[in-house]
Amino acid sequence: MSRLKKYNEFINTRVGFFSLLIGLLWLKNMFAYVVDFHLSIQNPMQLFILLINPLSVSMLLISIGLFIKRSKVAYTTLFIIYGILSIWLFSNAVYYREFTDFITINTMLGAGQVSTGLGESAVRLFRWYDIFYILDLFALPVLLFKKKIIVEEKHPRFRKAAALSALSLLICSGNIFLAEIDRSGLLSRQFSREYLVKYLGVNAFTVYDSYQTFQNNQIRAEASPNDLKEVKSYIREHYAEPNDSMFGIAKGKNVVYIHLESFQQFLIDYQLTDENGVNHTVTPFLNSLYHGESTYSFDNFFHQVKAGKTSDAETLMENSLFGLNQGALFTQLGDKNTFEAAPNILNQKAGYTSAVFHGHSASFWNRDKTYKHLGFDYFFDSSYYDVNDDNSFQYGMHDKPFLSQSVQYLEHLQQPFYAKFITVSNHYPYSSFKNDEDGFPLATTKDETINGYFATANYLDTALKEFFDYMKASGLYDKSIFVLYGDHYGISNTRNKELASLLGKDSDSWTDFDNAQLQRVPFMIHVPGTTNGGINHTTADRSMLSLLCCIY
C-alpha cells in the first residue's frame, strides 16, 4: 500500500507527470514496433537499441514543459507536446499499413495534391486496437480535471529540468553510437527509412528527415541552368561516332540486366584450394560467359560508388550519372529529379516495357519511388514472392528461389522488355547456406567474412546458370541480350591484406595499387548469336547507357 501511495505522490509532481507521459509514449512505440511496423530483431544489440530509441527525442521535447513556471501552462505544454507525438506515431502506423513506409516531410508537402478521397481511404485503414494509441489523450484530461492527477503548483528546480533534458541528449548520443556500431554508415548512406526508424525511432527519423529535406532544397535552390553549359560543351567536344560494325546488332531484342551483388573481378577464373589441396572453380558458369565468343567482356571496369553503394551503381548504369558525395541519390533525390534513364529512352524510342525484380522491401534505398522517376513500368518487390526464413536473409530472398519465382512475372511482360534482376545472396556477411546449398568449401583465413565470400559467389553462379537454362528453354534467350555487372567491392580495403595470400601475394608488400586493382568488377554484354565478342581492356571509355544505345 505504501508503494502505491508513493507512486501516486510521485505522479502528482510535474516530474512524475512528465515520467508518466514518457512511459506511456514508450509503450505506444513498442506496440507500434511489434504490431504495425513489424521491425525485425537479429541480435541483442538491436533489441536494446529498439528499447531506448523512443526516449531521446520524446524526453527532449516533452521536457520543455518542465522549464515553464506557471503550473497550468506547464501541464498544458507537457500534454500538448505528448499529444502531438502520440498522434504523429499513430499517423505513421496508419500510413505504414497502406504504403509500408514512414511519413516524410515531402510526403506531407505533397499531401495537398492528392487530398481528394484520402479521408475515406484513411478510415478504412483503422483497426480496433488503434484505441491504444489515442485512449489516453481523452483519459488524461479527464483525470486532471477530476483531480485524480493533481497539478503541482511548485515549479521544479531548473537543475532538475536541465538534468532531464541532458539525459535525453545522452540517450540520443548513446543511441546513435550503438546504431553505428551495429549498422555502420546508417546516417551517411541512408539506404532505408525502415532501418532509420528501427535504429533511431520515429521521432528521431522525422528530425533527421527534416534536416535532409532542408539541405536538399538548399542545394536545388542554388542550382542554375548555367551549370549545364560546361557539361554540354564537353559532350560536344568529345562526341564519338557510333561503330558501324556494331551499331544496331541487337535492335528489337529484350534487354536483361543482372546485378551481381558485391561481385569483384578477381572471382572470374578463380580457383579456391581447400584444406585437402583440391581446387574448386568458384564461378564456372560466369567464366564460360566471360570468355564466350558472344560476350563483350571488360576486365578493367571499376565500380564508382560511394555511400549509396548498390543504389549508386544503379544510378550510374541507368543514367550515366555518378552518385552523391554524401548520402545516396536514390534516397535524397530519387523521387524528386527528372531523369533521362535507359527505361525511359527505350520506351520512347522503341516501345519497351520495363520492370525491376528484387526480393527485398520496396522502400529499401527508396526504390519504390525512384524507379517510377527512372521510367520503370513495374517493380516486383518482396511482396510478390513467397519469402520465408528458409529462403531469405536480412537483405532479401536468396538468388535461386528469387530468380525461379521471378519467371512467372517475366513470362507475362510484353516484348520487347527491359528487365533488371537484383541479386543479393553474395552480400556481406557472406554466411554459408542451409541444407543442400551448404556445399562449396570455405576459405581458411583468419577472417570469416573472406572465408564465406567464395561460397556465396559460387551460389550466385549456380543460380545464374539455372536462370539462363530457363531462358533457353523458354525461347527468350535468343530474343534477348544480357548485361551483367558487379555493383561494388565485396571485400573492403581493411580486409585486403588478409585476402592477399589467396591471391598469391604477400600481405607485407601489399600496396595502395593492389587495393585499387581490387576495385574492379565484372562487366559483360552477352549477345546470343554474335561471334565477335572478346575481352576488352578499356580503362575508361563510354558509359553503359551509350554502349547500350550503340547496339540498338
Language-model region placement:
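Membrane-anchoring hydrophobic helices of lipid-metabolizing enzymes
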Residues: 210-233
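Solvent-exposed soluble domains appended to multi-pass membrane proteins
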Residues: 233-552
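Transmembrane and membrane-interface helices of multi-pass
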Residues: 2-211
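Exposed alpha-helical structural elements
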Residues: 113-114, 230, 285
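Glycosyltransferases that elongate glycans
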Residues: 65-69, 74-75, 81, 229-232, ...
